[in-house]
Structure formats: C-alpha cells, structure tokens
Amino acid sequence: ERAKSVDFAHPHYCTGGQIAAYKDGPLTVSALTGKTVGVQLATTYADAAKKLKGLKNIKTYKGDPEAFSALRAKKVDAWISDKFTVKATLDKNPDAGISAGEMVFVERVSMILRKNNKTLEDKLNQGLAEVMKDGTYKALSEKYFKEDISCRS
C-alpha cells in the first residue's frame, strides 16, 4: 500500500518477529500450538501472532518490557517480538533461562524515499552496494550487532 505513494531503496537490513521462550518451552512455530503468547499491542508481531494456527491465546501488552515480564512470570508460554529487541533483552537478562527461538516472519527494512526521486534512490542503492561489496557493512554489522544483519536473499 505504501509503495503507491513512496519509493523504497534496496533493503539495508533484515529483522522480523522472533519467538522467545524458556529453554524447555515452545521455541518453534509448530511448538506454539496450544500455547499462550505475549506480544506488544498494535505491532506487526501481534498481527503475525493472529495468523498463527493453533494458538490457545494471545495476550497483548503495552510494550515489550511488559510482555517479557509476563514470560518471566510464566503468564505466557512465549513472547514474539523484533529479533533485535529479543536479542537485546536476553543479553541484559542472561540468567533468565529464556532463549531466542525460531523466526515467525522476516522484515526487509528499507529507506523510504519521495516518489519518483530516482537520483537519490540510485545513489543510496549504489552506496549500499559498495559497502556491501567491500565488506564495510558486514564489519560494522558484526561490530555492533554481533552478526551480519544484511538481507542475504
């Protein structure tokens, strides 16, 4: 829908909805059958949870901290949120006994541009291609995120 009013540069990173649960909990989409998941209200993660078949219940929370607290308190079986939010939360809570699980969906994140601004779009795409090719993007990605966050496909 947005593509009708704006243009997008090539994706500069990939993220998406990721499951987090206790290590012996539902860490895959198929394992969520019959389970209750916590999500932040009015997000793509809440939308994705609604599309999952077989969930017992979806509990929505004001924010991810509340959803994570519900998981820690075992009020939900799993939490679905942004991959990097899950990673940062688990890094800050290493003794929680909670692990990152399977991705529910992938989001390819791109810069939004004014419609028909081909010059800017081409320059951004060229610059991104150059730093991808010479390894700069991967090096910075690994330095700050501990992994390559580029969209490889």
Predicted feature locations:
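Periplasmic-binding protein-like
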Residues: Y13-A20, K87-A129, E147-S153
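Short helix-initiation/N-cap motifs at beta->coil->alpha
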Residues: D24-G25, T44, K59-S69, A73, ...
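Short helices/loops that flank or line small-molecule/ion binding pockets
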Residues: S5-D7, S30-A31, K51-L52, P65-F84, ...
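Beta->alpha turn/N-cap motifs
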Residues: E1, Y22-K23, A42-T44, G63-D64, ...
